Amino acid sequence: MKIITTVQEMQQITNELRASGKSIGFVPTMGYLHEGHATLLRKAREENEIVVLSVFVNPLQFGPNEDLDRYPRDIDRDENVAKENGVDYLFYPSVEEMYPAEQTTTVEVVKRTDVLCGKQRPGHFAGVATVLMKLFNITLPTRAYFGMKDAQQVAVIEGFVADFNIPVTIVPVDIVREEDGLAKSSRNVYLSQEEREEAPHLYRSLCIAKERIEAGERNAEIITTLVKEYIETYTKGTVDYADLYTYPSLQVVDKIEGRIILAIAVKFDNVRLIDNITLTVK
């Protein structure tokens, strides 16, 4: 595995690889890698001749009161995970390398961002789309891999790739969970012991809701109320949202039918956790 820190060297390598006909699987991350990231890397390894991993904590996607400064970082750990999962190139640029001057152009996402995390975090997805436009141009991937834990992000990325005719296939990968159901996340390290014990109730609330839908419930408000009340009963977290939308278009659902997403965000003392399930309802 080779570690690359400059845009110029990374672009030169990927240009040569694509010119020689090699397929490139790309996994963009903010680091502090866990089993969820490892799953993305293994899938990229299975489906491509070359695997590129980026580790970059992107300041553009953090709001003024968010956790940019304390976002967990451990490049030694990330290098080990990368090596163990078949990464060929680890792209690890500095902020100054990615943004050497004030950004004069950003990608403004106008659809699929006014709900869920996009509603709570204005400007977040513009930051995500902008850095991905840069990373796609730097790494020239054949396929790019994203976890469905942030399903809204996947929907936004699929839309922006289609809109700009970017020649990359977006590959969504199922959520990876702890044994007790908690979705794996770099931010789980912020949980206190008590919060960690309560956190699996987020996924349990989604499973209970799924059972109700499969049993025939089609009223969206009944389902979202059930989820909120369950979380408020069994955790000390504050429900930021518990919402149902069509997926991937993220339109409001009254009657549950077709492909939908039930997504939640819950705030604990030092961390905000998200989770979701997608299902197709006939």
Curated annotation (Swiss-Prot):
Subcellular location, record wording: Cytoplasm
Pathway assignment: Cofactor biosynthesis; (R)-pantothenate biosynthesis; (R)-pantothenate from (R)-pantoate and beta-alanine: step 1/1
Cellular component, GO, one term: cytosol
Residues given in the record as beta-alanine binding sites: 61
Enzyme class: ligase
Residues the entry annotates as binding ATP: 30-37, 147-150, 176, 184-187
Catalytic activity: (R)-pantoate + beta-alanine + ATP = (R)-pantothenate + AMP + diphosphate + H(+)
Pfam families linked: Pantoate_ligase
GO function terms (MF aspect): ATP binding; pantoate-beta-alanine ligase activity
Entry binding sites for (R)-pantoate: 61, 153
Chief location of this protein within or outside the cell: cytoplasm
InterPro entries: Cyt_trans-like (IPR004821), Pantoate_ligase (IPR003721), Pantoate_ligase_C (IPR042176), Rossmann-like_a/b/a_fold (IPR014729)
Keyword line: ATP-binding, Cytoplasm, Ligase, Nucleotide-binding, Pantothenate biosynthesis
Keyword Signal: no
Family: Belongs to the pantothenate synthetase family.
Function: Catalyzes the condensation of pantoate with beta-alanine in an ATP-dependent reaction via a pantoyl-adenylate intermediate.
HAMAP family xref list: PanC
This protein's name: Pantothenate synthetase
Lineage: Bacteria, Bacillati, Bacillota, Bacilli, Bacillales
